[in-house]
Amino acid sequence: MGDIVHALPVAYDIKKHYPDCELSWVVEESFTDIPKLSPFVDKLVVTAFRRWRKNIFSSSVRGEILAVRRALAEAKYDIVIDLQGLIRTAVVARWAGVESVGYSKENIKEPLAAHFYSRTLPVSNKLVPVVRYRTMAAQALGYPIENEDLHYGLDVKPMTPTGVRAPYAALTVNTSRAEKLWPKSRWTEVARELADDGIMSVLFWGNDKERAYCEQIASSVPGQVVVLPRLSLRAIAEVIAGARCLLGVDTGLTHLGAALGIPSVGIIVGTSAELFSLVSESACATVGDNGVIPQPEEVLAAMHSVLAQAAVA
């Protein structure tokens, strides 16, 4: 999901330089809500690789794959740009039957993917994802990259959840990789400090394990932390858009908060702060680094700093 959020400014860039173009976005079915938030995306082409690979030989799956291939071929695109650089995304780009552009094999996560493209570009994999994706699209289409003109362009109406009083903070505590989790005790301490400042906290989850983790945090700060019901990505975006601030580990929802322009603090534990720091049009900060676990005091200080910056912006 983080890759999708990081690619959103590309849609704005392309429409800025080619306002009359029709822009399609290929996206996995579980993440369609994210590009739908952008007014610069005209059409979605939906894949289901996570589901397909579980039953790849069934006739229904083969039919779905054929339908996607047909849709891509019949669209008669002028160009396809693969921002993700995986074998499966390179294959999808090839299905369109037109020029496909991707990363060179020295700068791609799965080097075999480079062999599927019509043209490759040496866009460094050492760039932060937002800059990498914007650079790739700019070089592929021949327009200048303007780093100061970052625009995610999300169209989201804020929503305060039932049972939550404003102001509230959105805490994105879960992630698919255990090494990126911040210790539960530190989340509890942050939630208590927020409560002392009159700020409730809301938590999100996507499976039973994540819900249990959220409930353990909430039980340590009774009445001040609300574990929300399972929500769609669209609904989560609306809740985040209504928050006073967002604090979260390196996960897609945290980057979504930054994309929405909410004062945000990213907590890095098991990834590179150089590559995965938050990038926003508004006030944001990142604390910690790979193997460097930040203290609650650092997170709270960063939160107060971004809130102060947002207040004078």
Task: Go through the PLM ranges and name each one.
Residues 1-313:
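Catalytic machinery of carbohydrate-active enzymes
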